[in-house]
Curated annotation (Swiss-Prot):
This is Taperin. InterPro entries: Phostensin/Taperin_N_dom, Phostensin/Taperin_PP1-bd_dom, PPP1R18/Tprn. The keyword Nucleus applies. The lineage of its organism: Eukaryota, Metazoa, Chordata, Craniata, Vertebrata. It is found in: Cell projection, Stereocilium; Cell projection, Microvillus; Nucleus, Nucleoplasm; Cytoplasm. One of its GO terms (biological process) is stereocilium maintenance. GO terms for molecular function: actin binding; protein phosphatase 1 binding; protein phosphatase binding; protein serine/threonine phosphatase inhibitor activity.
Length: 753
């Protein structure tokens, strides 16, 4: 036993302490991983195991993983919230990178309780989306060729027998298959028609409507009858008109029948009552264009609903369809909405904590072009005249129109949301502006009454100038009453459109008295628009020059004349210029515009600059400039040597009286039109535009090379007169000595202080 006791500590004494500690740590790690306690672990074994357990831990408790999961979880509802609010009528959404501003449209009516029964004027049938990734990609990118080829009304003939012979079980099974639509099943009391009743599947939480059975005469030829009842409305949806499309006078009289005013969304697709006669206006499908309602991409802040196309944001140029279809002076009255100058908001009434409201109000305060778009409604019985005028109502108000007026008494033109018409409609509005001779009025392209989005910082397309004499009539008088139009009815949602000018003149206009006549002074044309440019800066037959440096007199006179409502006189002068260069004006209008300091407000308590200290053009700047030649910066200036400077200091004591007399004489010689330089002592180096023989650049001044020829400048630096007339040290200052020198400094690349 004694020998065994001696053999046991033998290896222990041979093994070093550091090696024994490593082994103990290894045993502790193995015990922690296997779950059992280590038999030969040292006293620090359990501590080591606890440290490992705390450092690793489960991944669900990792703080980094937890933050990442919370970020993903928070980003998902933001996208869903954006898409949801974009489809809600009466709500305007403005989305930036990480900001979503949601505000209710003013004057939008309250929600209507669901109706017990609805007599449908049209039925919207949605096809089941194809399963798989390919269909989702097709829906995301919305390729228009495949859906039109598959489900367009003209090529939908093979599927005709499926509609009349559809079993009743399919109609009752449809609500259960479509979980997105809480549609009640078809009423069993209704008789079975040739076309089985199909529930209207409405997504995004909107209530689905149970409609009455339709009774088209399905016994006729399928090709002849299908085009009268079907209309393609999207990649996977089409519209069934039970009473038929308005192809004849009988259908038109039938479609003007009464309709229950309790429909919350009105008929789908924005067609209230009966669409106009196909001779006047044809849907998008018949003109072989992309589908009427393309489903928006999930990542884009589109206001177009994915589900029922009852509330759609019109395309940028579709605010006035009559002007898009018939470009003539007969349709220039713009009977769908009215533009009025908007008043500036009161910043004192906005609470300080509401940063978003203050930012929007500041944008409107600093904008030169602020509009209020007020939709107009015709009285019952006023149909479009023979000239082709149509009345368009915003999509967000179709449901309300069905409550306040009979839907059969209105004609609402369907506005397509496809961006393919932007170029053609923009050219049409340009042509309209040329024919009218008026100044195209800029406005933000999206003139939807229920959704407001911010456009990128580029000059927007032109909105027709329909309110030529509005500012003179004041805010209370509608600008279109002179054309015989009815006044605006109360309760309609209006849209405010603000356009911030890119120059300093925005603040000059904001300083003008705006309460004199009751008209805001910022209501005038954008100075960079083609109409304004051709009026002020037309240099040739078809050349329009944009010069940012402009005197305040020439800048404010046309603005005042336009504010007083004198648009027609400028329109007559610009008619020939607009006719000669429409392409140039369009090119100038679509140039990229960068935001200026006037458009940027630092939210967070730093500073909101009213003007830039580095702005290039402006009437209130100081005349001090620093000019450099960009090509020869390294050899532009030459400073005197130390020896010549010491020699100059010795001569200063002898010639103090001559210096004062020479300074007076030099000030008399330099006039407003003479090109002379002035000299200051170092280190206050002066900036000379040109050098005359009287005052050469000597020891205490330098001469820029670009102001004269290089040979003369070289000779002048070699032959420097030591007895140079100089300023006394007490007159060293930042500004020039004489005020007459202010007009001598002109150079293009300059900094203004």
């Amino acid at each position: 036993m004694a020998g065994l006791g001696r053999l046991d500590p033998g290896p222990r004494t041979v093994m070093p302490a550091w090696k024994r500690e490593i082994l103990e740590r290894r045993r502790a790690k193995l015990a922690a991983l296997s779950g059992g306690p280590g038999s030969g672990a040292a006293p620090d074994g359990p501590n080591e195991r606890l440290v490992l357990a705390e450092s690793l831990g489960p991944l669900s408790q990792n703080p980094f993983m937890r933050l990442e999961s919370e970020r993903r979880r928070g980003a998902r509802p933001a996208q869903q919230l954006l898409e949801l609010y974009c489809r809600v009528p009466g709500v305007r959404t403005i989305r930036a990178d990480n900001i979503l501003i949601i505000e209710s449209a003013p004057g939008f009516p309250p929600a209507v309780p669901p109706a017990s029964s609805i007599r449908a004027a049209e039925v919207v049938v949605y096809e089941e989306p194809q399963p798989g990734r390919v269909s989702r990609l097709l829906e995301k990118f919305d390729s228009p060729a495949a859906p039109r080829r598959r489900g367009s009304p003209e090529r939908f003939r093979p599927a005709l027998p499926q509609l009349p012979v559809a079993p009743a079980s399919a109609a009752t099974r449809a609500p259960t298959n479509r979980s997105l639509a809480p549609a009640p099943p078809v009423l069993p009391s209704q008789p079975a028609p040739p076309i089985s009743p199909v529930p209207v599947a409405q997504r995004a939480g909107q209530r689905s409507a149970c409609c009455e059975p339709a009774h088209p005469d399905g016994t006729a030829g399928p090709g002849a009858r299908r085009s009268d009842f079907l209309q393609k409305t999207g990649s996977n949806s089409f519209t069934v008109h039970p009473r038929g499309l308005p192809g004849s006078a009988v259908n038109r009289s039938l479609s003007n029948g009464p309709m229950t005013q309790e429909s919350p969304a009105g008929p789908a697709n924005g067609l209230s009552g009966s669409p106009p006669v196909p001779g006047k206006w044809k849907p998008k499908v018949e003109s072989k264009e992309p589908s009427l309602h393309p489903p928006p991409s999930p990542g884009t802040p589109s206001a177009t609903p994915v589900g029922p196309p009852a509330f759609l944001a019109p395309s940028p140029a579709s605010a006035t369809p009559s002007q898009r279809q018939w470009v003539s002076s007969a349709t220039s009255a713009n009977d769908s909405f009215e533009i009025r100058p908007s008043s500036k908001p009161d910043m004192e009434t906005i609470p300080i904590g509401d940063l978003q409201a203050r930012a929007l109000a500041n944008l409107r305060v600093n904008s030169r072009n602020s509009f209020v778009l007020i939709p107009k409604r015709k009285a019952p019985g006023n149909y479009p005249s023979a000239a082709g005028r149509q009345f368009e109502e915003p999509k967000g108000e179709v449901g309300w129109a069905s409550q306040s007026q009979g839907l059969g008494s209105q004609l609402v033109s369907t506005v397509d949301g496809a961006p393919a018409l932007e170029k053609s409609s923009l050219a049409a509005e340009m042509q309209w502006a040329v024919r009218e001779g008026g100044c195209p009025r800029p406005a933000i392209s999206d003139t939807d009454k229920s959704v407001r989005r911010q456009r990128p910082a580029s000059p927007p397309p032109f909105l027709p100038a329909t309110t030529e004499a509005e500012p003179a009539e004041g805010l209370g008088v509608p600008g279109l009453t002179k054309n015989g139009q009815e006044p605006v009815r109360p309760g309609l949602p209006v849209t405010f459109i603000d356009e911030v000018d890119s120059e300093e003149a925005a603040f000059q206009e904001a300083k003008l008295p705006s309460s004199a006549v009751g008209v805001p002074s910022q209501y005038h044309l954008h100075p960079s628009t083609p109409g304004h440019t051709s009026e002020l800066l037309n240099r040739g037959s078809n050349t329009f020059t944009v010069v940012p440096k402009r005197k305040p007199g020439t800048l404010q006179e046309p603005h005042l004349s336009q504010t007083n409502g004198q648009f027609q006189q400028g329109a007559e002068e610009q008619d020939a210029d607009s006719l000669s260069g429409p392409h140039t004006t369009l090119e100038n209008a679509l140039k990229k515009r960068y935001p200026t300091v006037n458009e940027i407000e630092v939210i967070g308590g730093y500073l909101a600059l009213q003007k830039s200290c580095l702005i290039k053009a402006g009437s209130s700047r100081k005349k001090m400039k620093i000019s450099f030649n960009d090509k020869s910066l390294h050899t532009t200036f030459e400073y005197p040597s130390e020896s010549s400077l010491a020699q100059e200091e010795a001569e200063e004591e002898e010639e103090e009286e001559e210096e004062e007399e020479g300074e007076d004489g030099e000030e008399e010689e330099v006039g407003p039109d003479s090109e002379k330089s002035f000299t200051v002592l170092l280190p206050r180096a002066t900036f000379v535009s040109s050098v005359g023989p009287e005052s050469s650049s000597g020891l205490s001044s330098y001469t820029p090379k670009h102001s004269m020829a290089f040979s003369k400048w070289q000779e002048q630096t070699l032959v420097q007169a030591p007895t140079e007339v100089e300023l006394p040290p007490k007159e060293v200052m930042l500004t020039p000595a004489s005020q007459n020198d202010l007009s001598d400094f002109r150079s293009e690349p300059a900094l203004y202080f």
